[in-house]
Swiss-Prot record:
GO terms for molecular function: ion channel inhibitor activity; sodium channel regulator activity; toxin activity. Transmembrane segments: none annotated. Gating-modifier toxin that inhibits voltage-gated sodium channel Nav by shifting the threshold for channel activation to more positive potentials. This toxin moderately inhibits human Nav1.7/SCN9A (IC(50)=459 nM) and weakly inhibits hNav1.2/SCN2A and hNav1.5/SCN5A (<20% inhibition at 1 uM peptide). Inhibition of Nav1.7 is voltage-dependent, with lower inhibition at more positive test pulses. This is Mu-theraphotoxin-Phlo1a. It is found in: Secreted. The keyword Disulfide bond applies. The presence of a 'disulfide through disulfide knot' structurally defines this protein as a knottin. It comes from Phlogius sp. (Tarantula spider). One of its GO terms (cellular component) is extracellular region. Belongs to the neurotoxin 10 (Hwtx-1) family. 39 (Jztx-34) subfamily. It comes from the Eukaryota.
Length: 89
């Protein structure tokens, strides 16, 4: 019984990957949801507003000022921005 369930799940997984690949091939290199395309359409001003003047949202950092508001640089490795447990402006 367990083997037949595992085989069924494996077949369904392979079919999903196969149909997804076929659908991607039908559409070609359609990049409608690409972040680069959104930046080109909306312009840099949308992504660089005064409110978002921070350098790192959740990426690497070396000091607290590298992170966005309400985030701080983690003190131990791996260094990245984490929530500093504050809310509000």
């Amino acid at each position: 019984m367990k083997v037949s369930v595992l085989i069924t799940l494996a077949v369904l997984g392979v079919m999903f990957v196969w149909t997804s690949a076929a659908e991607q091939e039908d559409h070609g290199s359609d990049r409608r949801d690409s972040p680069a395309l959104l930046k080109n359409l909306l312009g840099e001003e949308v992504f660089q507003s005064e409110e978002r003047a921070c350098r790192e949202l959740l990426g690497g950092c070396s000091k607290d000022s590298d992170c966005c508001a309400h985030l701080e640089c983690r003190k131990k490795w791996p260094y990245h921005c984490v929530w500093d447990w504050t809310i509000g402006k």
